[in-house]
Amino acid sequence: MTFMVGCDKENFEAVKHVLVGMGKNVFHCGGPGTGEIAKICNNLILGINMIALSEGLSLGEKLGIDPKVLSSIISVSTGRSWCVDTYNPRPNILENVPSSRDYNGGF
């Protein structure tokens, strides 16, 4: 888990030890609200990556490449992203991700 914290430096230093115990990455982004800005920007990039991966896999399949093979290629090439390796939106590429569970809830 990554924490993106927006507050003054003094308050950040006061709570950092608690956050480090809960997450792998802790960043002080600046003043109040900057943590949310960082989160929104990160989520925008994630959304774009998910859309690009979905479109690329669909195009590849329509042109004759097995989506599993194409995902394997992408995961070791310049198109690699967290989406390909950890949260692939294409069903049956990765186990235990929402797309492979018909988007049913659960952890």
Regions found by a protein language model. Give the residues of each.
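Internal alpha-helical scaffold of NAD(P)-dependent oxidoreductase catalytic cores
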Residues: 4-38, 44-84
